[in-house]
């Protein structure tokens, strides 16, 4: 089968560099240049690449390794061209867009922050809601006075109100965390999450010299909001996946 060119990322260098780190299928990667930008590629069979954990991690490792060259724009997993001239055409047609993004993201890192809760955290938030929500307090008083038949439905209504208010409160708390981190970053992006327990999944663009301070701030927020039932998990620095 003919080998194609698998593209990992765009870099702000056209120098023909071979990276020591290996990419997909254990093959070394190199730079195909155009003007003052380049694409980091490696040879792979010209066929659809399976989105397996190993392949995705190999893609991510090469993107991170490419940052040694300079500013990096990650390319979507699975991007393959049949021949080298296909990569050159991509660089030629998209040059202005790539150049603008490379300039914007120079000296920047991406950090990820997830805010989530576990059973203990949810119980803590629910307990706070039961004590502070005027509606819940009112229903609890009504429950104490209600007869057996009415009390059953009142209790169901109260439990649903507690649950709804607890989730609203967690959203409110996660927004406080997000707003704080926004003030400590250059740009932010809210990301999708498929897990109900994750109430915030966000990426933040941070100047490279400010990365340690950003992680320290996220750590302090984690300690502060753990008392309120939320867990804060931070990661990075990464290439700016969410901003290019």
Functional labels for PLM-detected ranges:
Residues 1-244:
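An interfacial alpha-helical scaffold signature
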């Amino acid at each position: 089968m003919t080998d194609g060119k698998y593209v990992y990322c765009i870099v702000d260098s056209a120098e023909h560099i071979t990276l020591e780190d290996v990419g997909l299928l254990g093959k070394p990667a190199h730079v195909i240049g155009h003007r003052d930008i380049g694409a980091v590629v490696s040879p792979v069979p010209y066929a659809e690449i399976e989105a397996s954990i190993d392949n995705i991690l190999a893609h991510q490792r090469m993107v991170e390794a490419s940052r040694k060259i300079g500013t990096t724009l990650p390319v979507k997993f699975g991007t393959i061209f049949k021949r080298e001239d296909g990569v050159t055409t991509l660089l030629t047609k998209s040059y202005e867009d790539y150049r603008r993004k490379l300039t914007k993201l120079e000296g920047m890192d991406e950090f990820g922050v997830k805010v989530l809760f576990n059973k203990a955290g949810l119980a803590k938030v629910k307990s706070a809601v039961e004590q502070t929500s005027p509606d819940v307090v009112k229903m609890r008083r009504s429950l104490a006075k209600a007869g057996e038949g009415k009390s059953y439905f009142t209790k169901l209504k109260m439990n649903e109100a507690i649950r709804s208010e607890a989730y609203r409160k967690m959203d409110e708390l996660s927004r406080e965390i997000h707003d704080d981190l926004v003030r400590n970053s250059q740009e932010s992006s809210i990301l999708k999450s498929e897990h109900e327990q994750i109430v915030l999944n966000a990426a933040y663009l941070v100047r490279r010299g400010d990365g340690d301070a950003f992680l320290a701030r996220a750590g302090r927020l984690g300690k502060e909001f753990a008392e309120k039932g939320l867990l804060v998990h931070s990661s990075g620095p990464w290439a700016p996946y969410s901003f290019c």
